[in-house]
Amino acid sequence: MLPTQAGAAAALGRGSALGGSLNRTPTGRPGGGGGTRGANGGRVPGNGAGLGPGRLEREAAAAAATTPAPTAGALYSGSEGDSESGEEEELGAERRGLKRSLSEMEIGMVVGGPEASAAATGGYGPVSGAVSGAKPGKKTRGRVKIKMEFIDNKLRRYTTFSKRKTGIMKKAYELSTLTGTQVLLLVASETGHVYTFATRKLQPMITSETGKALIQTCLNSPDSPPRSDPTTDQRMSATGFEETDLTYQVSESDSSGETKDTLKPAFTVTNLPGTTSTIQTAPSTSTTMQVSSGPSFPITNYLAPVSASVSPSAVSSANGTVLKSTGSGPVSSGGLMQLPTSFTLMPGGAVAQQVPVQAIQVHQAPQQASPSRDSSTDLTQTSSSGTVTLPATIMTSSVPTTVGGHMMYPSPHAVMYAPTSGLGDGSLTVLNAFSQAPSTMQVSHSQVQEPGGVPQVFLTASSGTVQIPVSAVQLHQMAVIGQQAGSSSNLTELQVVNLDTAHSTKSE
């Protein structure tokens, strides 16, 4: 045997005896007892004897073939990163003993001399590359920081969208599940598909017809050029102002498992400071509502009872002044809240419209905790001259907090209005005032003869002027929650009808 072959045999015998190699064949296993002495002295047969002279010579020849040029490039790469040979070389190196330690290689150098050490080093070239962290057969680059810019390659862009959309949906689910928060996520692809994730309270934003119409209106609108408004740019930035001016009150009913209809998110209209006394007139049968055409939301004015012990605080926002207030005291029938005419519900902000005040006033008797008093609701119409430009009072609340509160659902072409205590059965009324020309909206009263009936108010419009959805849901009569048996509160039922239909809506 040549010295080179003897050194290689000794190294192989040592590695096999320590159990770090995959070359433990059935023929080599009987000689395992003398493996240690065979490796140290090179004379006593160990596992190396079990390999047979033919196999050993082939291994030594393969090791000697790679000896002449053990350069740094061969040590680190060995082949192209994408080639198949790189993987084969790496697997072959693992079969020849990937778990050998540095001390074992030093033993091989001592036994076989410089030539054996060179042969061993050359034979395990890819192993050194694996230790350095640059595996030749690795297909992915791992974590690489990419530039935050639009991807021009269409295939790469589609792939990135698919992966990251799935990831952000998963993150939204994890956020809502781990922390119990309400999450609404909407992703619209460039192919026209809309993907959404919403928790229980926010599902009506994407399942109701009004919510779908609002989403489609926003997505179908032309993309406006970048504006000089700094707030818009900051909100589109990852490090911008994430918090909005919208707030909602969290109460015990969030964890009591109420129905989804009761916990619908909504805009709750609360107290407005600076409201002057309105001129009350006798109930009439019509009211004129003039709305100038423009790219803003419709304006609906009405009066509602509010708490007398409210001290609101003003908060400024990009879409106009928003006053947030909370009411927790008993409802007073003497206090009137007037929603002004110049509030606009539109993303991005819009110029508020000036509309003469025409309002629907709701008188409501005090609803105390006393079980012996019944409260009733009657509907009258008031009107005041001039133009009101007071700021809007809007407060988001997912749970009704006061009995006299009212809720509004904004939409691109309508404002949905309903008392909070009437939302238990999913009732909703659409007050639609969006038109291209001044129009007239009729409010007619109907008397109910049978006892226990619900007074009704019909909002009708002439054909072609005011578009009122026929599928509007009526407000039904229901008892106010929290009062004892024998005491109930009748709510006024508002029915929205359209003169275009052949038949009028039936009263419940």
From Swiss-Prot:
Q: Per the annotation, which location comes first and is thus the protein's main one?
A: nucleus
Annotated Acidic residues bias: 81-91
Q: Name one Pfam family in it.
A: SRF-TF
What exactly does this protein do? SRF is a transcription factor that binds to the serum response element (SRE), a short sequence of dyad symmetry located 300 bp to the 5' of the site of transcription initiation of some genes (such as FOS). Together with MRTFA transcription coactivator, controls expression of genes regulating the cytoskeleton during development, morphogenesis and cell migration. The SRF-MRTFA complex activity responds to Rho GTPase-induced changes in cellular globular actin (G-actin) concentration, thereby coupling cytoskeletal gene expression to cytoskeletal dynamics.
Q: Which GO terms describe its biological process?
A: actin cytoskeleton organization; angiogenesis involved in wound healing; associative learning; axon extension; bicellular tight junction assembly; branching involved in blood vessel morphogenesis; bronchus cartilage development; cardiac muscle cell myoblast differentiation
Q: What is this protein called?
A: Serum response factor
- Low complexity biased stretches: 1-28, 61-80
Swiss-Prot/TrEMBL keywords: Activator, Developmental protein, DNA-binding, Glycoprotein, Nucleus, Phosphoprotein, Transcription, Transcription regulation
Record bears the keyword Transcription regulation: yes
Enumerate the GO terms in the molecular function aspect: chromatin DNA binding; DNA-binding transcription activator activity, RNA polymerase II-specific; DNA-binding transcription factor activity; DNA-binding transcription factor activity, RNA polymerase II-specific; DNA-binding transcription factor binding; histone deacetylase binding; primary miRNA binding; protein homodimerization activity
For this record, the Gene Ontology CC terms, alphabetical, are: chromatin; cytoplasm; nucleoplasm; nucleus
PTM sites of type Phosphoserine: 77, 79, 83, 85, 103, 224, 253, 435, 446
Name the domain of life this protein comes from.
Answer: Eukaryota
Task: Kindly list every residue the record annotates as glycosylated.
Answer: 277, 307, 309, 316, 383
